[in-house]
From Swiss-Prot:
This is Uncharacterized protein ECU01_0030. It comes from Encephalitozoon cuniculi (strain GB-M1). Residues 89-123 are annotated as: Disordered. Residues 98-109 have a biased composition (Polar residues). It comes from the Eukaryota.
Amino acid sequence: MDVCTITGMTARGRLRVSRSSRWCWVQGGGMYMATRLGCIQREMCEGAVSGLWEEGEDGGTRTQMGKRAREVGLEEGVLLLWRTLDLGGVGGRKLGSEGQSLSENSEQRSLMRWGCGGSSERR
């Protein structure tokens, strides 16, 4: 497993990603999200991350991640999320449609460029 360190903006922390898997980063609700199911739309991320983390320096546990993933209709282990500085404004919309392309949105494209693959930093 390669480790990507995310800094700047509203994100702080480390997120482990596998170089051999198909990962994409999406920013939503003060979170950065990675999914093996493919790239999903930003507004869907905002609903998916709601209520995922307990307060704490490390943000949460793998068990909590699996529980929340099931609640939004994903299999346990599909989502790897890391807590960020600000979880405000996150809605309760259910995550519904996986695999949607980020190519139509230049902001999301830029997030994907720096986020997918080995170690990188957001400047």
